């Protein structure tokens, strides 16, 4: 119990005896705390907070704001666009577009598609093992075939797009994704087979 409360509760006859002791205790308590309390500031909501706490909060918030700004200014990589084919735009040339859609239909339904998935499977099986190749080889056959067809379609739509795709356009697109293909060997194999299928469209 603080000394100043003790003095109030004690009988009056002991008041004078404890007066000096109470004063000493009060002085020692006062000396153990800073003489000037932390500055208090009013917030917008009307509550009062310590200026020290406010400074700490603002200090920690700065790196987060900087990081978000850097992320918003980061330009999308070409490989992000390749993964999302719809962001690349479709083929505008009516003739090439018709030939492309016809080819993709054959990949899914005709003997061309059967030959394609067999070729891809054998090339992936013969290549140096990677996490992606292992995943594909362990798939059930029907799932694997569909997976390889979908990846082939993605590369076909990536390679044949724009006003009218020519050989120089393909060369430029290949150079853009070349660093990615050097890391992802499975994607390189699929892209090569897709190009073999689509070469006649570009050469027309």
From Swiss-Prot:
Belongs to the respirovirus protein C family. This is Protein C. GO terms for biological process: symbiont-mediated suppression of host innate immune response; symbiont-mediated suppression of host JAK-STAT cascade via inhibition of STAT1 activity; symbiont-mediated suppression of host JAK-STAT cascade via inhibition of STAT2 activity; symbiont-mediated suppression of host type I interferon-mediated signaling pathway. Transmembrane segments: none annotated. Residues 1-78 are annotated as: Disordered. Keywords: Host-virus interaction, Inhibition of host innate immune response by virus, Inhibition of host interferon signaling pathway by virus, Inhibition of host STAT1 by virus, Inhibition of host STAT2 by virus, Interferon antiviral system evasion, Viral immunoevasion. Residues 10-20 have a biased composition (Basic and acidic residues). InterPro entries: Paramyxo_C. Residues 25-34 have a biased composition (Low complexity). It holds the Pfam family Paramyxo_C. The keyword Heme does not apply.
């Amino acid at each position: 119990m603080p000394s100043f409360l003790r003095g109030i509760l004690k009988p009056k006859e002991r008041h004078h005896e404890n007066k000096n002791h109470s004063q000493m205790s009060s002085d020692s308590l006062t000396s153990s705390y800073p003489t000037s309390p932390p500055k208090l500031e009013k917030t917008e909501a009307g509550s009062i907070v310590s200026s020290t706490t406010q400074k700490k909060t603002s200090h920690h918030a700065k790196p987060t704001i900087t990081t978000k700004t850097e992320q918003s200014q980061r330009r999308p990589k070409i490989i992000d666009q390749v993964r999302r084919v719809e962001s690349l735009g479709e083929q505008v040339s009516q003739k090439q577009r018709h030939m492309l859609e016809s080819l993709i239909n054959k990949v899914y339904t005709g003997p061309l598609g059967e030959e394609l998935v067999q070729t891809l499977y054998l090339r992936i099986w013969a290549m140096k093992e990677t996490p992606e190749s292992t995943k594909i080889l362990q798939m059930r056959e029907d799932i694997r075939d569909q997976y390889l067809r979908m990846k082939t379609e993605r590369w076909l739509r990536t390679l044949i797009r724009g006003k009218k795709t020519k050989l120089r356009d393909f060369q430029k697109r290949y150079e853009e994704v070349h660093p990615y293909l050097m890391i992802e060997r499975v994607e390189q194999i699929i892209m090569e087979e897709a190009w073999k299928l689509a070469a006649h469209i570009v050469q027309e």
